[in-house]
Regions:
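N-terminal hydrophobic signal/anchor transmembrane helix of membrane proteins
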Residues: 76, 106-118, 192-213
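Conserved SGNH/GDSL esterase-like catalytic core that processes O-acyl groups on lipids
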Residues: 47-52, 58-147
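Alpha-helical scaffolding segments of alpha/beta enzyme cores, especially the outer helices
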Residues: 141-144, 148-152, 187-194
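Alpha/beta-hydrolase-fold catalytic nucleophile elbow
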Residues: 124, 165-166
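Substrate-gating cap/lid alpha-helix
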Residues: 170-207
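Residue-level recognition of beta-strand->loop/alpha-helix junctions
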Residues: 88-90, 166, 205-208
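A short helix->loop->beta-strand "cap" motif at the edges of active sites that frequently abuts
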Residues: 157-161
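N-terminal secretory targeting modules
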Residues: 1-54, 58-68, 74-83, 114-117, ...
Length: 213
């Protein structure tokens, strides 16, 4: 099991476009470096290596002036090159929790991610699970729900390489910062680390490199 560390993007809409763009550049560069070094396309490949970026608004590129060119999956595609096919399956507001206020499992992006049958899946979910509607009520379901997401990806491609991410920081500007979100996010980070071990997937860090930002 590997424990690589890569950089991250921010989810706080209060950030300037320049800062968001800079963070997403870091996000793409570090992630592409990691993937490129440790999972290269072989000469026997029948086609490009399929990379699914699964997540929430951070993956989707919400708040960017031009998400079609600035969202981190786009930057990742640029850095990895033609031997890879990177697709953005981010859904703004999505929760990992199946009983959260906007479950990723119920979104069209989830269905499309499975139909894509990725060779590599990068999952960054958990930020929206800190919502008071979610974590206080369903926190015991977070780890089982994460396992279910991993299992469904493995069902469509048993050889899929899965990387799950510690979540990006939540800034003091966020209206929920003082409502328990800070403590809940720490609990979610710990849960994600447990999932990485129990599901035998790789853990990457989208938090520490941007804290404090």
């Amino acid at each position: 099991m590997h424990s690589p560390s890569v950089s991250s993007a921010s989810t706080i809409s209060a950030y300037s476009d320049d800062k968001q763009f800079t963070m997403r550049i870091k996000y793409g560069l570090y992630l592409s470096l990691f993937l490129g070094l440790s999972f290269s396309a072989s000469a026997e490949s029948k086609g490009p290596i399929r990379v699914a970026c699964i997540g929430n608004s951070i993956t989707y590129g919400y708040g960017l002036a031009d998400r079609e060119h600035e969202a981190y999956p786009v930057l990742l595609q640029q850095k990895l090159g033609a031997k890879y096919q990177v697709e953005n399956f981010g859904k703004s507001g999505a929760t990992l929790l199946a009983r959260g206020h906007r479950p990723y499992f119920q979104q069209e992006e989830y269905k499309k991610a499975l139909a894509f049958r990725p060779d590599i899946a990068v999952i960054h979910l958990g930020v929206n699970d800190t919502d008071p509607r979610n974590w206080p009520n369903y926190q015991d379901e977070f780890i089982p729900d994460y396992h279910h997401l991993i299992d469904t990806l493995r069902a469509v491609n048993p050889q899929v390489r899965i990387l799950i991410a510690r979540t990006t920081p939540i800034g003091v500007e966020h209206p929920r910062f003082e409502s328990g979100t800070r403590d809940w996010q720490l609990q979610i980070q710990q849960a994600i680390e447990q999932v990485a071990k129990s599901a035998d997937v790789e853990l990457i860090d989208f938090h520490a490199p941007l804290y404090p930002y």
